Amino acid sequence: MSSAFKPVITQAGITAVFNATNSGLEANIVAVALGDQSWSPTSAATKLKKEKRRIPVGNGNKLSPNQIHITAIEDGQQQAYWVREVGFYLEDGTLLAVWSHPSQPLAYKAPGVDLLLAFDVALSALPRSLIQI
């Protein structure tokens, strides 16, 4: 059994979510960014350290009020790289959440092979029902 994917929620992401909901809008996660730089993200992050590719969310649904399931396919790169950082971007381009580990990669993207990504993302730092996919 896998554990929930727990990225760091960014301050910019929290601000964008609250601005959207105060305007009567929803904050929509529309893209997943992949990078190959290992680091220890903080809430001050506004972008990945070394983004390789930004891909649209393929599918998503809410598992609970503060947990979502997101899928995406990285199929455009012919270059090989280790996925060491992941970012979740809102419709307005704001980085909502970021994950990285200083020493452990998440996956490997081989040239000419699609990489199917599926994330169960815990967003417990955000109030219920503010995020859509």
Show the residue positions of the predicted features:
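N-terminal assembly/attachment segments of tailed bacteriophage virion structural proteins
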Residues: M1-I133
